[in-house]
């Protein structure tokens, strides 16, 4: 059929020269997460311009309306001026339904699904009909070309890393087999909600965190403390905040801080009675999220925060979200390719909150309750067949920007790349040390990948008690190794001497006053100078932090982490005080924390 169409099309063009712009096309749209104009959609909120593109290498549902809807229409997809696909459009009566048999999206649009291989930068679309000239000869009438705004193609990689705390295990909470990852059906639905080409949700190489205690940082006027059950926390988000801080360290030591790789940690912990304690919420931001183990509304909300999304209602109040009260009033309809149906911006009858929605929801001009964004209490607004509700179309711009600004590692050739949104292409990128090392080196990328490593996490309080200075249990996995500096090596220390070394601002954030010393089973030692200290910002050689002796201040507390090669067994890990560490360390350096293994 495709070959016949191509031959008819080309034959008609050659013989009759009738491929003129005779078809009047009224509207062309493409649907992925949302149904948007073929040229994309742009917002200007208080002179802040945001644009939503079509995601490359992802299937897209094509809709087109014509001046004469009664004709049979075809579309051709072109790439680099080569024809890659003619397709017959389905007539408006065959347009997919709306969730829960809701109002039809359109009665005038012809449509067809485009495979992901055809959705790429540089594609163009043309429509045509095949008629008869009255003399028994075929005549092709064609349209102008349409140029979809296709943007970046990218795969969202997400680690899942369950936290089992205070004696939580497979028997008294949930089995690791259930919490360690997201099954394929959930992944399929998430792809339909997030603006990405593909999604890989994988259990982190560490597999899980299993600790009997947790060191809480100073928070909300409370001092740091060691807790052994969830009832000891001082506020509802305290443990979750601590989990996010741990995840920050893990992303950093694995060399993922500048990547788009996300991490989510289901939190399973026990209360003072040894019973499972539901976290009743979640917390997210900075590519990290934590919450319950069900991978439902809390999960998708927190991973929205992880990609930079704020609460939609608060953003509306600030003028940075376009739709009233964080709703979807004005947002384009959604589309779910898995179910081949449209998702209205109004609550469907089987939604959890449908029954009493008129008491608190915005109402449209047809008397229907308008959905809330996932980022504003929208969980429960979806049809019962779905696990997750919808984001607003505008929120896809934040998600797309999240990926545009990341560094990508190409596993096929061991190189890095970044996206250029002007040329709409990836380009080779070599990581560099920016800002003279102030926030780290090598763009936060590792120097070795996929090797056996120990992840060492630790805490220290400058005011005590001593139990606040801890070396957590070792975590062994397959991971990455960052470039490190050894304070016993004068050549390496010369590189980071403040103001004069090759990386002169390495210690300017808070000083370089701590070293981790690792003793292996062959009695060999490894020293790693930390980019952490006691100093005021930009005072690496002098003033201590103002509140370094205040137990309720974050100035008095440190959480850190490193990865070291696991080619030898570790016997002991120590955290040393090594003031002005670029000067080297003494044989009698103060041991702040120590643990033997």
From Swiss-Prot:
EC class name: hydrolase
Any one cellular-component term (Gene Ontology): extracellular region
Residue ranges of the TM segments: none
Residue ranges annotated for the Peptidase M66 domain, each copy included: 148-409
Localization per record: Secreted
BP-aspect Gene Ontology terms: proteolysis
Residues reported to bind Zn(2+): 301, 305, 311
InterPro entries in the cross-refs: Dictomallein (IPR051256), Peptidase_M66_dom (IPR019503)
Cofactors named for this entry: Zn(2+)
Keyword Metal-binding in annotation: yes
Keyword field contains Cell membrane: no
Keywords: Hydrolase, Metal-binding, Metalloprotease, Protease, Secreted, Signal, Zinc
Record's protein name: Dictomallein-3
Organism annotation: Dictyostelium discoideum (Social amoeba)
Gene: dtmlC
